[in-house]
Regions:
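Basic, polar low-complexity surface loops/patches
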Residues: 1-225
């Protein structure tokens, strides 16, 4: 769980197929908090328990756990998607006991989700690159709704007379296209990312991924060759 949380952020859930159930594990005590079984049990209205009910304390050896039958997977995954908050790592099993192998089958997030769309609104994941030179912003914007394939690309620049013009144009784009997930990339630490998010009124937005480096063009060339 810690690995995936490092990659995808604090609102990451692991759903693991164990026998005929999907289960969520975690630890929530005075010393450490790992995972969100208590939070998810409340949202899904399912029972929260411990691996060994006879032991009151929960820890890595006796974790908290909550789960639901595999037959009800679509129902509960749709409910979690409705929160528009979580990146959900789905771990499935194959083989027969005792030779069970578990693997990552899918990763769902508010902006990368095709099979469990809950309404007919646009559902964009947007990537933004922000550069600043002499307090003048240059911004690149790309957004895609993976459920429809609808895509937008845009580049804008501020001016000496209006140094926040690019941010204002970006604000308009984000408001025009329903943004479920946002990736903000800047060059280095010199740009205050939180200040930008606050300006765009995304300061409290749950699904924001921050990057202080940009992937080189060679990565794009290799990916699409």
């Amino acid at each position: 769980h810690t690995h995936f949380e490092t990659v995808y952020g604090p609102n990451t859930l692991l759903l693991m197929e164990v026998g005929s159930f999907f289960e969520i594990y975690g630890v929530d005590n005075d010393k450490e908090t790992i995972g969100k079984p208590r939070e998810i049990a409340d949202i899904l209205n399912i029972q929260l328990t411990r691996k060994d009910k006879r032991v009151k304390e929960n820890n890595a050896k006796n974790p908290l756990m909550a789960g639901f039958p595999t037959a009800t997977f679509d129902r509960y995954i749709t409910r979690l998607i409705q929160e528009k908050k979580y990146t959900i790592v789905i771990i499935r099993q194959k083989g027969t006991p005792p030779n069970i192998i578990r693997y990552v089958d899918n990763i769902l997030s508010p902006g990368v989700n095709i099979d469990y769309c809950i309404d007919h609104q646009d559902n964009f994941i947007a990537s933004i690159i922000v550069e600043k030179h002499h307090d003048i912003y240059s911004i690149g914007y790309a957004a895609i709704d993976v459920s429809t394939g609808k895509t937008y690309l845009f580049e804008t620049h501020s001016t000496k007379e209006d140094k926040t013009a690019a941010l204002d144009e970006l604000f308009r784009l984000l408001q025009s296209h329903n943004t479920a997930e946002l990736i903000l990339s800047t060059n280095g630490e010199s740009i205050d990312q939180q200040k930008i998010l606050d300006y765009l009124e995304f300061g409290e937005f749950e699904q924001v991924h921050l990057r202080h480096t940009r992937v080189p063009i060679s990565y794009q060339n290799e990916l699409f060759k």
